[in-house]
Each structure stands twice: as structure tokens, then as C-alpha cells.
Amino acid sequence: MSNVIAIIKSEELVELGALMVDLPQNADGLKVLITRFEGKVRAWINSCPHDGSPLCRDPAFLWEKRKKLLQCMNHQALFNAKTGICEEGPCKGKSLYGLITKEKNNQIIVSKGEPKNG
């Protein structure tokens, strides 16, 4: 069984962009958000640590672009785009669940597992 969740072309994800893909084999219908910030790709489960609801339904609205933070559509919680830690809102100090990302040969690969910091 593979740990790979998604493989996408690098050019599909621009700086301060976000894409949403299905999380395979989950009974809850969870999705994965893939973001690019300061050139680095990161992936998060689309679930707010405040109440488990989706951060967004449309990735075009995930970013709070002035502050360059990820924003939950429900309670406007703001998350650090590098660490996933909530900086403002009802879940301050809690973190999004991150996934492993690797960008190589013009492809972004998202895999199950906890990412290394950075």
C-alpha cells in the first residue's frame, strides 16, 4: 500500500496559491490543501483544529493575502503558512495537521506522515 496521496505538476501551484485534493481511503470525506509559500510547498488536512470543520470549501479563498496567513472560513482563525500553528482565533496555539511534501522533477508529491519542520 502506497503512502502517496497526490501527485501534481509543479506549475499548477503558484506562490500564495492553494489546491485541494481528495484524501483517499477516509470515511469522513476529508480533503487535503496543498499550498506554496515563499517557494516551499506544504500540505495540510482541510480540517480546523477548533471544531473539525473544513478550513475552506474553495481553495481560492484560503489565503488572507495581506497577512500571508491561511484563514478558516468559519471563525476566521489565522494559521501560519509555514508551521500550521493558529496565530489568531478560537484555536490559538493549536496546529493544522501537516503532511509530507516533496517537489522534484517538476512534480509535487504529497504523502501520508508527519512533515519535518521547516
What are these regions (language model features)?
Residues 1-63, 81, 95-118:
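N-terminal pre-ligand scaffold of iron-sulfur
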Residues 8-9, 87-89:
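Short, P/G- and charge-enriched loop/turn segments at secondary-structure junctions
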Residues 58-88:
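Mid-chain, well-packed structural core segment of small domains
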